[in-house]
């Protein structure tokens, strides 16, 4: 699914899922890195994010895969 990843003012990250009109904060990263990792959102979803360069400019829309969550 297409998601938009943004950097928040406080230093964290959030994800917007346009298909679901959902915005959620990333609360945990499996490998302590954003790209090529599994992100857990504050609503319980887990998304597998693509492996992109560390310095990718945000916000960016990417194809993510949902692994778990309602």
Predicted regions: what they are:
Residues 20-23, 27-39, 69:
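Exposed regions on extracellular, virion, or secretory-pathway luminal proteins
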Residues 1-28:
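N-terminal acidic leader/helix
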Residues 4, 38-40, 56, 61:
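Residue-identity detector for threonine
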Residues 14, 51-70:
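Short, surface-exposed, low-complexity cationic segments
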Residues 33-46, 51:
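Acidic, low-complexity, intrinsically disordered interaction modules
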Residues 6-11, 31-35, 53-54:
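Short, ordered beta-strand-loop transition motifs
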């Amino acid at each position: 699914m297409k998601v938009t990843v943004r950097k928040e003012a406080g230093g964290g990250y959030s994800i917007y899922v346009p298909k679901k009109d959902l915005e959620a904060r990333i609360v945990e990263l499996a490998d302590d890195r954003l790209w090529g990792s599994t992100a857990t959102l504050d609503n319980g979803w887990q998304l597998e994010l693509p492996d992109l360069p560390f310095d990718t400019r945000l916000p960016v829309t990417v194809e993510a895969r949902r692994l778990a969550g309602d």
